[in-house]
């Protein structure tokens, strides 16, 4: 028979192992996103479990977000890891987009009030665990509060832009 404290120690060890296992499995699943079997509308592309569409008619950030919300579960695109960033980069480059910037769902609704750029978030409320700034928006002299992909970085890195500028945009939505 085990002493009463042994059960709580063993329970704690088991819980710790299970938590560690789930974290490790989660990391592997991000690296190998299975190709989704979803049907996306004409003019959009599937990646993971979402559809992505680039719209070339320029809109302000807010109007682009509203346009994306007309699609099921739609918002301006959130870029959650480097694999998704690479997918978006090649998608935007393939279209022959002539603009220097393209809207994504990144914005700072606090207008810089949070220290160290802490106010930036995705329009669909996805958690920001991946960062890929072309320049640090909290230290720039000409700070702006809406996010875009930058042509100078091959559409891989993010740049803060004035929200009222009209740019092409990428929507991410369910198929």
Swiss-Prot record:
GO terms for biological process: acute-phase response; defense response to Gram-negative bacterium; defense response to Gram-positive bacterium; response to bacterium. A motif (EPN) lies at residues 114-116. Disruption phenotype: Mice are more susceptible to salmonellosis, but not listeriosis. Constitutively expressed in the small intestine, moderately in colon and at an extremely low level in healthy pancreas. InterPro entries: C-type_lectin-like (IPR001304), C-type_lectin-like/link_sf (IPR016186), C-type_lectin/snaclec_domain (IPR050111), C-type_lectin_CS (IPR018378), CTDL_fold (IPR016187). Coiled coil: none annotated. GO terms for molecular function: carbohydrate binding; metal ion binding. Keywords: Acute phase, Antimicrobial, Disulfide bond, Inflammatory response, Lectin, Metal-binding, Secreted, Signal, Zinc. Pfam families: Lectin_C. PROSITE patterns: C_TYPE_LECTIN_1, C_TYPE_LECTIN_2. Residues 47-172 form the C-type lectin domain. Residues 27-37 form a propeptide. The keyword Cell cycle does not apply. Proteolytic processing by trypsin removes an inhibitory N-terminal propeptide and is essential for peptidoglycan binding and antibacterial activity. Residues 1-26 form the signal peptide. It is linked to Overexpressed during the acute phase of pancreatitis. Bactericidal C-type lectin which acts against several intestinal Gram-positive and Gram-negative bacteria. Lacks antibacterial activity against S.typhimurium. May play a role in protection against infection with S.enteritidis by inhibiting its translocation from the gut lumen into intestinal tissues and further extraintestinal tissues. Acts as a hormone in response to different stimuli. Secreted by different cell types to activate its receptor EXTL3 and induce cell specific signaling pathways. In pancreas, is able stimulate cell proliferation. This is Regenerating islet-derived protein 3-beta. It comes from Mus musculus.
């Amino acid at each position: 028979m085990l002493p009463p404290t042994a059960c709580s120690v063993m329970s704690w060890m088991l819980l710790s192992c299970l938590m560690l296992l789930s974290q490790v499995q989660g990391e592997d699943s991000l690296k190998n996103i299975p190709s989704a079997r979803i049907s996306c509308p004409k003019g959009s592309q599937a990646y993971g479990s979402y559809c992505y569409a680039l719209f070339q008619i320029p809109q302000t950030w807010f109007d682009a977000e509203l346009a994306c919300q007309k699609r099921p579960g739609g918002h301006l695109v959130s870029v959650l890891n480097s694999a998704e960033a690479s997918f978006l980069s090649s998608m935007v480059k393939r279209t022959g987009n002539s603009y220097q910037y393209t809207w994504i769902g990144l914005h700072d609704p606090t207008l810089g009030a949070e220290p160290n750029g802490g106010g930036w978030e995705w329009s669909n409320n996805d958690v920001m665990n991946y960062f890929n700034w072309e320049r640090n928006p909290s230290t720039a002299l000409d700070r702006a509060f809406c996010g875009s992909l930058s042509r100078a970085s091959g559409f891989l890195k993010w740049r803060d832009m004035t929200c009222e500028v009209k740019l092409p945009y990428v929507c991410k939505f369910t198929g």
